[in-house]
Amino acid sequence: MKATVKGRYEGDKATAAATLAFTPSAADLRFKASATDAAFARGPSLEGLTLTLEKPGSFLLDLKPHSKDVRFQFMNSALLLDRRVSLTYTHSTTLSPGPAKPPARTALDGSLTFDPANKLSLSHTLGSSGCRVKYSYAHGQDRLTTIEPCFDTANNAWDFAVTRKFQGGDAIKATYQASTKLLALDWTRDSKIGASFKVAASFDLSDQSKAPKLIAESTWNYEI
């Protein structure tokens, strides 16, 4: 059994989350229970609890007992002309009765991997007027630098992301959303002791009077 504890600090607000994952030795299914601090803030409750059943690379089922939200995800991949093609179908809905319940949402995601350095991805939400097309290019022999331009046809806008990995588990990522003029910088570190750390800052370039938004996260993994 594996346990994960995550802490997140955003301005003057701190949140925490914990996950327990159990994989039967005779099966490739994985059972997972995740809870945020909302599950314990006012005594034990179902709020903030998510139950997951998944078979990696095949399907995933998420259930939030408090809101009765359900998410189904099915994925598959195959070789087509020596190119890896991957497809993911995601359907989100709620079992809660009432006229105010949010509408169901269905999304399709596909990717075509040309080689280890080049991949084309496409995502579309059924009922929407557009899609997102992303190209990923990993530069160099070790592919430590990744460049990812993305075009949103619905908003007619570009997003750009550049990630640089370093020896030792460090990585720096910069993203820019042209539609919102939002610039984000992330630094992450993966530790050999089963922990990871992340510090992020985002800047609203459309209103330079706003202070940057700072976020710090830490994740710890344990074997039980």
From Swiss-Prot:
The keyword Hydrolase does not apply. Residues 1, 29-32, 65-70, 112-116, 141-154, 179-180, 223-224 are cytoplasmic. One of its GO terms (cellular component) is pore complex. The chain crosses the membrane at residues 2-11, 17-28, 33-42, 56-64, 71-80, 102-111, 117-126, 131-140, 155-166, 170-178, 181-189, 213-222. It is found in: Plastid, Etioplast membrane; Plastid, Chloroplast outer membrane. One of its GO terms (molecular function) is porin activity. GO terms for biological process: regulation of monoatomic ion transmembrane transport. Residues 12-16, 43-55, 81-101, 127-130, 167-169, 190-212 are chloroplast intermembrane. It is a multi-pass membrane protein. The keyword Membrane applies. Keywords: Chloroplast, Ion transport, Membrane, Plastid, Plastid outer membrane, Porin, Transmembrane, Transmembrane beta strand, Transport. Belongs to the plastid outer envelope porin OEP24 (TC 1.B.28.1) family. Homooligomers form large rather nonselective pores in plastidial outer membranes. High-conductance voltage-dependent solute channel with a slight selectivity for cations transporting triosephosphates, dicarboxylic acids, ATP, inorganic phosphate (Pi), sugars, and positively or negatively charged amino acids. This is Outer envelope pore protein 24, chloroplastic. It comes from Oryza sativa subsp. indica.
